[in-house]
């Protein structure tokens, strides 16, 4: 049986565009195959969900504060009216520990991201030349991908 998905074309497109929008069949399996192929080509990979991402640059790359959920009546004396702010390390910090490797950030459920959030992901890729980002933008009958900038033009400008 021939190898159906070698990942060569995907790797070439990822190298040239740095940021891809991908449409995979809903039954799954393609993501892990492509991730395995990219790891074999020397990428360090990190997969996470795009839900609840907020500001992508701050959430993925910088130390930021998160307020815990409000749990009803609490005393105002200790923490003020807004509550205490807990510092959270960047979600993709383990991806940026090694500077010598190419890095691949794979975001699931990318269809929930707004146009400005997608544009900030492209900006993150242009600032870090070793980082590539793949955003899953929904399902399709067959595996397809295109540059994220082309997806933004097609989806939001029309």
UniProtKB/Swiss-Prot annotation:
Stated family: Belongs to the complex I NdhN subunit family.
Cellular location(s): Cellular thylakoid membrane
GO cellular component: plasma membrane-derived thylakoid membrane
Name of the protein in its database record: NAD(P)H-quinone oxidoreductase subunit N
Matches recorded under InterPro entries: NAD(P)H-quinone_OxRdtase_su_N
Function: NDH-1 shuttles electrons from an unknown electron donor, via FMN and iron-sulfur (Fe-S) centers, to quinones in the respiratory and/or the photosynthetic chain. The immediate electron acceptor for the enzyme in this species is believed to be plastoquinone. Couples the redox reaction to proton translocation, and thus conserves the redox energy in a proton gradient. Cyanobacterial NDH-1 also plays a role in inorganic carbon-concentration.
EC class of the enzyme, as a word: translocase
Subunit-structure text: NDH-1 can be composed of about 15 different subunits; different subcomplexes with different compositions have been identified which probably have different functions.
């Amino acid at each position: 049986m021939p190898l159906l998905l070698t990942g060569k074309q995907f790797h070439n497109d990822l190298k040239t565009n740095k940021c891809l929008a991908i449409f995979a069949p809903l039954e799954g399996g393609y993501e892990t195959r492509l991730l395995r192929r990219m790891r074999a080509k020397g990428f360090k990979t990190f997969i996470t969900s795009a839900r609840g991402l907020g500001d992508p640059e701050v959430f993925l790359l910088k130390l930021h504060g998160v307020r815990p959920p409000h749990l009803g009546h609490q005393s105002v004396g200790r923490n003020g009216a807004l509550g205490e702010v807990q510092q959270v390390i960047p979600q993709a910090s383990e991806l940026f520990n090694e500077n010598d490797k190419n890095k691949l950030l794979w975001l699931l459920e990318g269809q929930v991201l707004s146009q400005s959030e997608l544009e900030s992901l492209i900006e993150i890729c242009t600032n870090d030349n070793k980082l590539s980002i793949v955003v899953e933008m929904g399902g399709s009958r067959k595996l397809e991908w295109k540059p994220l900038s082309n997806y933004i033009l097609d989806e939001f400008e029309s």
